[in-house]
């Protein structure tokens, strides 16, 4: 069992129940899924770029990503309908908790000039999104084998009813929010 999953079930549920003033433990917010998205607009020009991006995302997530394709042609961006423009992967269960553990303990502290995560990135329903400018913050990525620095979006979907519950959940997991 993943370390954070065990920690959530044994300690955080009881702590959050009293902290949020909930009656039932089933009301306690939990993390449903984590979605990683990497936009690769240059893949329209060179197919190798998409391969490198897929390999990076596979190493980070531990699971094969899905290629996202453009929905319509846009002349200004020089893309056509159906061309590959990105990759995404959705993590659930143990893989999700293992990724969250690596994100909190290793990747976020390795971000250059890091001053804390913005608490304004909640969507109003308790879900949190953050962007990372460099994929090399993750230990799975070998710096010498990286062709170019790419960023990725991380969306954490929770069962929280509002932003306050979502913030309390992520803070309990150890997310370093700005004060």
Swiss-Prot record:
GO terms for molecular function: rRNA binding; structural constituent of ribosome; tRNA binding. InterPro entries: Ribosomal_uL5, Ribosomal_uL5_bac-type, Ribosomal_uL5_C, Ribosomal_uL5_CS, Ribosomal_uL5_dom_sf, Ribosomal_uL5_N. PROSITE patterns: RIBOSOMAL_L5. GO terms for cellular component: ribonucleoprotein complex; ribosome. The keyword Ribosomal protein applies. Keywords: Ribonucleoprotein, Ribosomal protein, RNA-binding, rRNA-binding, tRNA-binding. One of its GO terms (biological process) is translation. The keyword Transmembrane helix does not apply. Pfam families: Ribosomal_L5, Ribosomal_L5_C. Part of the 50S ribosomal subunit; part of the 5S rRNA/L5/L18/L25 subcomplex. Contacts the 5S rRNA and the P site tRNA. Forms a bridge to the 30S subunit in the 70S ribosome. NCBIfam families: PRK00010.1. Belongs to the universal ribosomal protein uL5 family. HAMAP family: Ribosomal_uL5_B. This is one of the proteins that bind and probably mediate the attachment of the 5S RNA into the large ribosomal subunit, where it forms part of the central protuberance. In the 70S ribosome it contacts protein S13 of the 30S subunit (bridge B1b), connecting the 2 subunits; this bridge is implicated in subunit movement. Contacts the P site tRNA; the 5S rRNA and some of its associated proteins might help stabilize positioning of ribosome-bound tRNAs. This is Large ribosomal subunit protein uL5. It comes from Francisella tularensis subsp. holarctica (strain LVS). The lineage of its organism: Bacteria, Pseudomonadati, Pseudomonadota, Gammaproteobacteria, Thiotrichales.
